[in-house]
């Protein structure tokens, strides 16, 4: 009976408590606890964010709170924090006691409340350069400036999953780590700095919003709107995503978007106005600096026009010899290529156009090397601006007049071409080269004729004024002028007139550079012979000086040598008179210091006696040679004298011309003995010298008489200079006769040798 009773009791117990009822209870308990953790997750996240942004900042609870304080402390997720104020509890009701399948996302916004902005102040934002940018003014339309936006959301799983017993403590520990990182990050964000900067000035506000509802930016400056407009590529905001917490019911996520600028401050209206003025001044200054005149950013049109002529020119090649000549070029007209009013390219002193318009030629027959050196000098000076920045290319841009006839001195450089406009009377510098000095001719008369008629700067510049110092009593300058007065070295073929010069300038310059170089190479043997002759002359000169040293007298000067040679010539004349009764007195002047500069005279025979005397006087005046160094003419007959050294005396016979009432009468033949050392192969050509005309202006006739007339017109200003030249010749003759009377006999005839084959004409 007792056993039956026990079996009945066990059956009743099993009927009230089935085997699966315990498992279901445990499952429901786990789901309820996980749901509570998810709900507290939203609350705890809002509490951490609001505590770091809200006013006043709550104090950290103590480790051993009292019973009253413990009731106000939130201990969830192992973070002891003061409970959320009652004002915010109503906003959090939406996330309490709600089904997880319908729980909405939570949005927490932190903003600057502009409603309490003082009337006399303005909220500004400072950029990286500490320039203020106006954010909002008092009583404006914008009442809020959004600084950051937090998003807390839960994504439920689409499939049902069983909550495991060990899952709850794992998810809880993951949430603890996440909240601790958020707690530290909220105090490192820009909004926390804004809270410190605007403390007791402007409060920060917070909003808890339903993430399922649209967010309106009306009446406030939204998070997506930039305040500083200078940023082009980089954004004014950034986003941060935290590590999510995964559960069997769903995933918990937290992210934030915030402004990177935090330099918000309040400025007085007057202070802001002055700062705006200062900022505008700085911007204008930067614009002026960027648009100011510089060698790289100045007038593009000027740069194009000034560089365009250079592109059409071949590469510049420097001539191997510093050969200069004075040639007359025909007038060439060219339109102006500059634009008035443009700024200068470089900050250099302006150069007058009269000095820029001078073309420099290398050869006397207007060969192509004329244009090559002229192009070289123009390119070298094209970057130097004048007042109107006009690059000169063989033209006068203003008046359209012809280009002035060019000249070149013995320097072969730009020193003699460009004249300083501040000092118009500066003496030009000369650098002589003995190898090429015989190829130059310098005439102040032709320079006077070649003065340009107009100036780019509106000034009356003159070549005469620029070269007025050429007549100074300078021994070196006189020596150079004497050298430059001799005949020119011809590089090319026969001479051509003005039309030939124009034709040669239009030919390619590079081919003529090669021709000039070949011509110089062909003259190597002659220059070698010239060098040997100079060396021999120096040796003879040393012998002569050693012979004179026996007299215990110092080295003779130019005048002493001149007097000595006059004595030698007197002795020579006495010997001639004793040998032949028909021999007349013959005088010769020898320039001991620079006698070899008379070489390289080409054969030419003047056909008129007037032209002979005119040529002598013009050469003396153009070179500014003193009477003691001029080549005089004396009455007599030529004679031959044998000498032991290579010294040359060229006898030039002519007739003395005198005019009375327009009638010309011829007197006895005159003979000029030009003495000089044998320094050139042309000296040994025993023919009467003929002076080649190198100043060809017209090519109508090629006869010698017309060439002589044209040369006379260029070297003189008129026929009236003939009489003055005759008077000067007479004075020189008197001076020579006086020296002959005072001279004594001298047996030393080392430096005297006459031309054996000279003849009268």
Curated annotation (Swiss-Prot):
<dbReference type="GO" id="GO:0005776">
    <property type="term" value="C:autophagosome"/>
</dbReference>
<keyword id="KW-0653">Protein transport</keyword>
<keyword id="KW-0963">Cytoplasm</keyword>
<dbReference type="GO" id="GO:0006974">
    <property type="term" value="P:DNA damage response"/>
</dbReference>
<feature type="region of interest" description="Disordered">
    <location>
        <begin position="544"/>
        <end position="642"/>
    </location>
</feature>
<dbReference type="GO" id="GO:0034727">
    <property type="term" value="P:piecemeal microautophagy of the nucleus"/>
</dbReference>
<comment type="similarity">
    <text>Belongs to the ATG13 family. Fungi subfamily.</text>
</comment>
<feature type="compositionally biased region" description="Basic and acidic residues">
    <location>
        <begin position="710"/>
        <end position="720"/>
    </location>
</feature>
<keyword id="KW-0072">Autophagy</keyword>
<feature type="region of interest" description="Disordered">
    <location>
        <begin position="1"/>
        <end position="25"/>
    </location>
</feature>
<dbReference type="GO" id="GO:0005829">
    <property type="term" value="C:cytosol"/>
</dbReference>
<feature type="compositionally biased region" description="Polar residues">
    <location>
        <begin position="445"/>
        <end position="456"/>
    </location>
</feature>
<dbReference type="GO" id="GO:1990316">
    <property type="term" value="C:Atg1/ULK1 kinase complex"/>
</dbReference>
<feature type="compositionally biased region" description="Polar residues">
    <location>
        <begin position="344"/>
        <end position="367"/>
    </location>
</feature>
<feature type="region of interest" description="Disordered">
    <location>
        <begin position="277"/>
        <end position="367"/>
    </location>
</feature>
<dbReference type="GO" id="GO:0000407">
    <property type="term" value="C:phagophore assembly site"/>
</dbReference>
<dbReference type="GO" id="GO:0015031">
    <property type="term" value="P:protein transport"/>
</dbReference>
<feature type="compositionally biased region" description="Low complexity">
    <location>
        <begin position="429"/>
        <end position="444"/>
    </location>
</feature>
<dbReference type="GO" id="GO:0034497">
    <property type="term" value="P:protein localization to phagophore assembly site"/>
</dbReference>
<feature type="compositionally biased region" description="Basic and acidic residues">
    <location>
        <begin position="600"/>
        <end position="613"/>
    </location>
</feature>
<feature type="compositionally biased region" description="Acidic residues">
    <location>
        <begin position="695"/>
        <end position="709"/>
    </location>
</feature>
<feature type="compositionally biased region" description="Low complexity">
    <location>
        <begin position="566"/>
        <end position="590"/>
    </location>
</feature>
<comment type="function">
    <text>Plays a key role in autophagy. Activates the atg1 kinase in a nutritional condition dependent manner through the TOR pathway, leading to autophagy. Also involved in cytoplasm to vacuole transport (Cvt) and more specifically in Cvt vesicle formation. Seems to play a role in the switching machinery regulating the conversion between the Cvt pathway and autophagy. Finally, plays an important role in biofilm formation and resistance to antifungal compounds such as fluconazole, itraconazole, terbinafine and caspofungin.</text>
</comment>
<dbReference type="InterPro" id="IPR040182">
    <property type="entry name" value="ATG13"/>
</dbReference>
<feature type="region of interest" description="Disordered">
    <location>
        <begin position="488"/>
        <end position="507"/>
    </location>
</feature>
<dbReference type="Pfam" id="PF10033">
    <property type="entry name" value="ATG13"/>
</dbReference>
<dbReference type="GO" id="GO:0006995">
    <property type="term" value="P:cellular response to nitrogen starvation"/>
</dbReference>
<dbReference type="GO" id="GO:0019887">
    <property type="term" value="F:protein kinase regulator activity"/>
</dbReference>
<comment type="subunit">
    <text>Interacts with ATG1 to form the ATG1-ATG13 kinase complex.</text>
</comment>
<protein>
    <recommendedName>
        <fullName>Autophagy-related protein 13</fullName>
    </recommendedName>
</protein>
<feature type="compositionally biased region" description="Low complexity">
    <location>
        <begin position="1"/>
        <end position="10"/>
    </location>
</feature>
<feature type="compositionally biased region" description="Low complexity">
    <location>
        <begin position="290"/>
        <end position="303"/>
    </location>
</feature>
<feature type="compositionally biased region" description="Polar residues">
    <location>
        <begin position="614"/>
        <end position="631"/>
    </location>
</feature>
<keyword id="KW-0813">Transport</keyword>
<feature type="region of interest" description="Disordered">
    <location>
        <begin position="398"/>
        <end position="456"/>
    </location>
</feature>
<dbReference type="GO" id="GO:0000423">
    <property type="term" value="P:mitophagy"/>
</dbReference>
<feature type="compositionally biased region" description="Low complexity">
    <location>
        <begin position="632"/>
        <end position="642"/>
    </location>
</feature>
<dbReference type="GO" id="GO:0006914">
    <property type="term" value="P:autophagy"/>
</dbReference>
<feature type="compositionally biased region" description="Polar residues">
    <location>
        <begin position="400"/>
        <end position="411"/>
    </location>
</feature>
<feature type="region of interest" description="Disordered">
    <location>
        <begin position="691"/>
        <end position="761"/>
    </location>
</feature>
<dbReference type="GO" id="GO:0044010">
    <property type="term" value="P:single-species biofilm formation"/>
</dbReference>
<feature type="compositionally biased region" description="Low complexity">
    <location>
        <begin position="327"/>
        <end position="340"/>
    </location>
</feature>
């Amino acid at each position: 009976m007792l056993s039956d009773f026990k079996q009945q009791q066990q059956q009743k117990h099993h009927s009230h408590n089935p085997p699966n009822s315990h498992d279901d209870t445990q499952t429901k308990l786990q789901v309820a606890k996980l749901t509570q953790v998810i709900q507290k997750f939203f609350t705890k996240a809002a509490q951490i964010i609001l505590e770091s942004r809200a006013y006043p900042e709550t104090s950290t609870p103590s480790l051993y709170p009292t019973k009253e304080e413990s009731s106000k402390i939130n201990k969830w997720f192992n973070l002891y924090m003061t409970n959320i104020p009652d004002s915010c509890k109503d906003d959090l009701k939406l996330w309490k006691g709600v089904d997880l399948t319908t729980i909405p996302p939570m949005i927490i916004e932190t903003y600057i409340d502009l409603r309490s902005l003082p009337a006399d102040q303005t909220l500004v934002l400072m950029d990286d350069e500490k320039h203020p940018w106006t954010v909002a003014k008092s009583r404006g339309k914008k009442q809020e400036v959004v600084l950051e936006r937090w998003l807390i959301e839960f994504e439920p799983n689409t499939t049902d999953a069983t909550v495991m017993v060990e899952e709850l403590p794992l998810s809880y520990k993951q949430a603890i780590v996440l909240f601790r990182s958020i707690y530290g990050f909220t105090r490192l964000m820009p909004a926390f700095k804004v809270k410190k900067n605007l403390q007791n000035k402007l409060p920060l506000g917070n909003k808890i919003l339903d993430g399922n509802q649209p967010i309106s930016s009306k009446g406030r400056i939204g998070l997506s709107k930039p305040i500083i407009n200078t940023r082009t590529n980089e954004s004014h905001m950034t986003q941060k995503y935290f590590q999510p917490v995964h559960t069997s019911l769903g995933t918990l996520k937290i992210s934030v978007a915030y402004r990177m600028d935090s330099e918000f401050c309040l400025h007085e209206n007057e202070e802001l106005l002055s700062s705006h003025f200062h900022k505008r001044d700085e911007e204008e200054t930067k614009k002026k600096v960027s648009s100011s005149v510089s060698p790289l950013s100045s007038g593009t049109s000027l740069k194009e026009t000034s560089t365009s002529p250079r592109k059409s020119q071949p590469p510049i090649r420097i001539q191997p010899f510093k050969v200069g000549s004075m040639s007359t070029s025909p007038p060439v007209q060219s339109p102006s290529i500059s634009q008035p009013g443009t700024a200068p390219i470089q900050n250099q002193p302006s150069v007058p156009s009269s000095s820029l318009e001078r073309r420099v030629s290398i050869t006397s027959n207007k060969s192509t090397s004329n244009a090559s050196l002229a192009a070289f000098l123009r390119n070298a000076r094209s970057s130097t601006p004048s007042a109107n920045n006009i690059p000169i290319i063989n033209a006068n841009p203003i008046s359209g007049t012809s280009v002035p006839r060019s000249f070149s001195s013995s320097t072969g450089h730009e020193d003699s071409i460009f004249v300083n406009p501040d000092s118009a009377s500066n003496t030009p510098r000369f650098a002589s080269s003995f190898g090429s000095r015989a190829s130059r001719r310098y005439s102040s008369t032709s320079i006077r004729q070649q003065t340009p008629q107009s100036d780019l700067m509106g000034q009356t510049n003159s070549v005469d004024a620029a070269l007025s110092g050429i007549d100074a009593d300078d021994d070196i300058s006189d020596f150079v002028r004497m050298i430059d007065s001799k005949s020119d070295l011809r590089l090319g073929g026969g001479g051509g007139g003005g039309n030939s010069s124009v034709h040669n300038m239009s030919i390619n310059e590079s081919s003529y550079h090669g021709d000039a170089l070949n011509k110089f190479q062909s003259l190597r043997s002659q220059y070698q012979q010239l060098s040997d002759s100079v060396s021999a002359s120096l040796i003879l000169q040393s012998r002569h000086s050693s012979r004179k040293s026996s007299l215990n007298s110092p080295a003779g000067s130019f005048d002493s040598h001149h007097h000595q040679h006059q004595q030698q010539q007197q002795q020579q004349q006495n010997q001639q008179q004793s040998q032949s009764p028909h021999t007349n007195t013959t005088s010769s002047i020898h320039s001991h210091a620079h006698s070899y500069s008379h070489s390289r005279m080409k054969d030419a025979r003047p056909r008129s006696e007037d032209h002979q005397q005119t040529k002598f006087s013009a050469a003396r005046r153009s070179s500014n040679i003193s009477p003691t160094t001029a080549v005089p003419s004396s009455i007599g007959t030529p004679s031959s004298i044998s000498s032991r050294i290579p010294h040359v005396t060229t006898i030039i016979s002519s007739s003395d011309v005198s005019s009375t009432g327009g009638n010309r009468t011829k007197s006895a033949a005159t003979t000029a003995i030009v003495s000089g050392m044998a320094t050139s192969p042309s000296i040994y050509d025993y023919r009467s010298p003929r002076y080649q005309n190198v100043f060809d202006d017209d090519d109508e006739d090629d006869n010698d008489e017309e060439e002589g007339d044209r040369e006379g017109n260029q070297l003189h200003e008129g026929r009236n200079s003939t009489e003055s030249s005759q008077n000067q010749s007479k004075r020189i003759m008197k001076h020579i006769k006086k020296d002959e009377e005072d001279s004594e006999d001298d047996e030393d005839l080392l430096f005297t040798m006459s031309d054996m084959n000279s003849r009268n004409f």
